[in-house]
Structure formats: structure tokens, C-alpha cells
């Protein structure tokens, strides 16, 4: 169990480190016009696992928890951070659920804006972003798999 928990903590750390790259990218979207802003109360679900990935979100204020489909916390994001990019960039439905931890104001970045920014980006940078997005999805799935296995093991010990 100890090594399983360490592995999950490691995957959560990797996920946070990869999000630093997306934090740097957020500056590209900060000055974008025509962004809708939406307010969420603490506990509100912003999007759920398997929802269509039509938008990317930028936290203007507040905190957002990212969790796996079975409720494993994958990270807490704060003001200035982007989320929802993975499914959008790799063109798959949402692989996680996003929940407002505190009352939050979220800027919604539409698909057209994202495509314009990505098309203007250096092709190498665009490839790096896509590769990191794939790795985040894989790391999240692996963390959840091990978390579920640990829960089964714990239930057998009782």
C-alpha cells in the first residue's frame, strides 16, 4: 500500500509540474476579447467526465478541484491557471471532472479562439503542448487505476 500511495503522490506531482507549462501558455489567452465570464459557487460542477470538450477555462478568481471519474483528486488549481485543455487539445471528451472549491469566476475560451492561437503558435510548441496533454491524460488514468486497486486491497483487509 505504501508504494502505491507514493506512486499516486508522484503522479499528482507530475500532473502539477506539467500544468506549469500550461500556466506559461495562459498569457496567450489573457488579452483575448469576446470571452464569456461565468461565476460558479463552491461545490458547483463546471464540467463532468465525458462531457464534450468545447472550451478551455481560465480561473479569474477562486479555486477549482480536478478529479477523476471516481473522485480521486488530481489537483487544485488557482487564479491564473488554465484547465480543460487536455480533452480540447487531443479532441476527446472530458477525461476528468472540474468542481469549484470556492466561489470562482471563470473565463471561458471558445474553440475558435483556441484554434486561432494554436495555429499561430510555433509548430514545435504546438507539438509539445499536444504531447504533454496526452501524457497528462495517461498519468491521470494510471493514478486512478492504482487508486482503485488500493481501495480494493483496503476493503479486502477489513
Region annotations inferred by a language model:
Residues 43, 62, 80, 98, ...:
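Short hydrophobic/aromatic patches on the structural cores and recognition surfaces of FHA
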Residues 46, 73-74:
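Local beta-strand/beta-hairpin segments that build beta-sheet-rich folds
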Residues 76-129:
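Cyclic-nucleotide recognition modules
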Residues 22-67:
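Regulatory nucleotide-sensing modules
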Residues 51, 59, 69, 91, ...:
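A short, compositionally biased micro-patch
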Residues 114-153:
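A small-molecule sensor/coupling module
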Amino acid at each position: 500500500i505504501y508504494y502505491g500511495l507514493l506512486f499516486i503522490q508522484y503522479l499528482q506531482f507530475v500532473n502539477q509540474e506539467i500544468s506549469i507549462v500550461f500556466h506559461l501558455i495562459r498569457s496567450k489567452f489573457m488579452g483575448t476579447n469576446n470571452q464569456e465570464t461565468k461565476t460558479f459557487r463552491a461545490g458547483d460542477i463546471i464540467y463532468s467526465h465525458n462531457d464534450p470538450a468545447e472550451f478551455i477555462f481560465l480561473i479569474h478568481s477562486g479555486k477549482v478541484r480536478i478529479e477523476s471519474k471516481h473522485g480521486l483528486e488530481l489537483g487544485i488549481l488557482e487564479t491564473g491557471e488554465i484547465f480543460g485543455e487536455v480533452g480540447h487539445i487531443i479532441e476527446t471528451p472530458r477525461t476528468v471532472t472540474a468542481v469549484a472549491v470556492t466561489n470562482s469566476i471563470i473565463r471561458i475560451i471558445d474553440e475558435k479562439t483556441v484554434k486561432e492561437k494554436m495555429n499561430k503558435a510555433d509548430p514545435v510548441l504546438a507539438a509539445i503542448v499536444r504531447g504533454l496533454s496526452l501524457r497528462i491524460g495517461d498519468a491521470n488514468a494510471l493514478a486512478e487505476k492504482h487508486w482503485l486497486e488500493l481501495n480494493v486491497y483496503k476493503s479486502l483487509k477489513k
